[in-house]
A protein has these predicted regions:
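Nucleotide-activated chemistry modules centered on ATP-dependent adenylation/adenylyltransferase
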Residues: 1-181
Length: 181
């Protein structure tokens, strides 16, 4: 999604909310320092939105939109999400952000195509993908840091797990490879 927007010459700002008490993206369990490294690697501005317990999520995000507009001089018109097939989440986003164009360009794209594009991006940009959360199953376990590659995707499929982890079975972290890898 990000690469496509950048290739189209779009003005892109990466907006990420995180737990203010943990400095981590809550569900994915990713440290905001890693989010900053991603933004730097892809050369996109980053807007971090700290969320405290009992925070009004929509209000905080809208405040961030205002900051982005003030800093860039551009109006936020379109919100882009990487959702793959969870219709309830997509509909929530569309309803919550009704005053914006909500785009989900990866929605319902077949996994074979998504994975092909992902592996090409990993190679072209020299990226590494690993699990940012542990996957615990009755007959298998994959710890944090496990490489998310074609072999793991195949294993997940054999275990009846969504190969893109779209149902919350686990989450991934994409980072530039270290020079010595």
């Amino acid at each position: 999604t990000l690469m496509q927007l950048l290739e189209e010459g779009r003005n892109v700002v990466l907006l990420t909310s995180f737990g203010a008490l943990t400095n981590r993206v809550s569900i994915q369990d990713i440290d905001i320092k890693d989010i900053a490294k991603q933004a730097d690697f892809f050369n996109v501005p980053l807007c971090l939105v700290p969320l405290y317990p009992n925070t009004d999520y929509k209000k905080r995000i809208e405040e961030a939109f205002k900051v982005i507009e003030d800093k860039t001089g551009l109006q936020v018109k379109r919100l882009v999400f990487g959702d793959l097939h969870l219709q309830d989440i997509r509909q929530w986003r569309i309803k919550t952000w009704a005053e914006y164009e909500v785009s989900t360009p990866l929605f319902d794209v077949p996994y074979e195509e998504l994975l092909s594009r992902l592996w090409k991006l990993v190679t072209d940009k020299n990226l590494a993908i690993s699990l940012s959360t542990e996957i615990k199953l009755p007959n298998a376990s994959f710890p944090i840091g496990t490489r998310f590659d074609a072999e793991l995707v195949h294993k997940l499929g054999d275990l009846g797990i969504d190969q893109m982890l779209e149902n919350g079975e686990g989450h991934t972290l994409v980072m530039p490879k270290q020079r010595n890898q």
